[in-house]
């Protein structure tokens, strides 16, 4: 009998789940985390689906697996897993992983209060504030973000023509701002946004190409960001980020906030040093800031940072036994 055991630490970042896999991870081949990610997807994607999909996970589940870094300037490497695949970078996942990893001794930074992690998208610098054994806040300085395309259009049944900008913040995001056929996310239910997101994402991916100019392995539009006016004091904007097949991010979305800041910076509405507090669909806040200007393959870009908090909710030992369990590798109800 072959039974695989995965000890996990469960938690959430500003309301969105994070499952940190504390053991049982496979050895991966590759000179970089981007190459290791490709190996994982080729041979071990059943681990992702088994841990993220029902019956062990759910539509909003996301997680991370720790690895030794391939580069000397990083303390640890992170592979992100979720229902939609293995993201190059995940902001809320990073905040949760760092928080629970440090609190449980899985991550030991060389310099207390700061560390660098290797992600498939590149190096991410981290600062964290710890009080006793608890990590109270994590700020990550993300990979460069940039506006990729403006004014793209697609037809969405039930709404009509929708115009979006697409920006990169670690993943590609179609940003839907107030317009003729969409006034504010507050006018609609999460279920409506999910249904429209599936149509919009498919239409945009069919009509346009989305490829990172320096990392062609990062391609395709994966996320839809619906926007609206803030409802929490201090917030500058509100969002509902769609990912996977049925998920709306409960957090303000770290890479989505990075992409939004890149879009606003390209329009001249944010500059270096400016803060951007982003409100989620449930009212939690990420504190964004533009740390520096940058360029990506000749494009104007920014170096964004995101601050947020996470809490551990429990310990979980998960079994995957394909010989006895017909749903060992998970399932999705569509």
Curated annotation (Swiss-Prot):
Keywords from the UniProt entry: Isomerase, Plasmid
Gene label: hypF
Active-site residue list: 90 (proton acceptor), 253 (proton donor)
One MF annotation (Gene Ontology) recorded for this entry: 4-hydroxyproline epimerase activity
UniProt entry tagged with the keyword Isomerase: yes
Annotated residues for binding of substrate: 91-92, 223, 249, 254-255
EC number from the UniProt entry: 5.1.1.8
Protein name per Swiss-Prot or TrEMBL: 4-hydroxyproline 2-epimerase
Catalytic activity: trans-4-hydroxy-L-proline = cis-4-hydroxy-D-proline
Enzyme class: isomerase
Organism listed in the record: Paracoccus denitrificans (strain Pd 1222)
Quaternary structure, from the entry: Homodimer.
Gene3D superfamilies, per the entry: Diaminopimelate Epimerase, Chain A, domain 1 (3.10.310.10)
């Amino acid at each position: 009998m072959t039974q695989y055991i995965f000890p996990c630490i469960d938690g959430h970042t500003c309301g969105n789940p994070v499952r940190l896999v504390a053991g049982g991870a496979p050895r991966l081949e590759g000179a970089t985390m981007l190459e290791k990610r490709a190996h994982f997807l080729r041979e071990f994607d059943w681990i992702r689906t088994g841990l993220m999909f029902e019956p062990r996970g759910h539509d909003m589940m996301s997680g991370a697996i720790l690895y030794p870094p391939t580069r000397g300037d990083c303390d640890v490497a992170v592979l992100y897993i979720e229902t939609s695949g293995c993201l190059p970078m995940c902001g809320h996942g990073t905040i949760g992983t760092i928080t629970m990893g440090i609190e449980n001794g899985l991550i030991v930074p060389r310099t207390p209060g700061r560390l660098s992690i290797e992600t498939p998208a590149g190096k991410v610098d981290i600062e964290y504030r710890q009080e006793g054994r608890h990590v109270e806040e994590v700020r990550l300085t993300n990979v460069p973000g940039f506006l990729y395309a403006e004014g793209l259009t697609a037809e969405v049944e039930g709404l009509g023509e929708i115009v979006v900008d697409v920006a990169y913040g670690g993943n590609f995001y179609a940003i839907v701002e107030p317009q003729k056929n969409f006034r504010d996310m507050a006018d609609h239910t999460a279920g409506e946004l999910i249904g429209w997101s599936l149509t919009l994402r498919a239409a945009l991916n069919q009509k346009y190409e989305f490829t990172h100019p320096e990392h062609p392995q990062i391609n395709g539009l994966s996320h839809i960001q619906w926007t609206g006016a803030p409802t929490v004091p201090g917030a500058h904007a509100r969002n509902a980020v769609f990912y996977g097949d049925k998920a709306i991010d409960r957090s303000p979305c770290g890479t989505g906030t990075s992409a939004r800041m890149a879009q606003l910076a390209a329009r001249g509405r944010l500059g270096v040093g400016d803060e951007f507090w982003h409100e989620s669909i449930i009212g939690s806040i990420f504190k964004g800031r533009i740390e520096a200007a940058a360029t990506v393959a000749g494009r104007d870009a920014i170096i964004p940072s995101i601050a947020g908090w996470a809490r551990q909710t429990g310990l979980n030992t998960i079994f995957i036994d394909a010989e006895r369990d017909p749903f060992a590798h998970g399932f999705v109800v569509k």
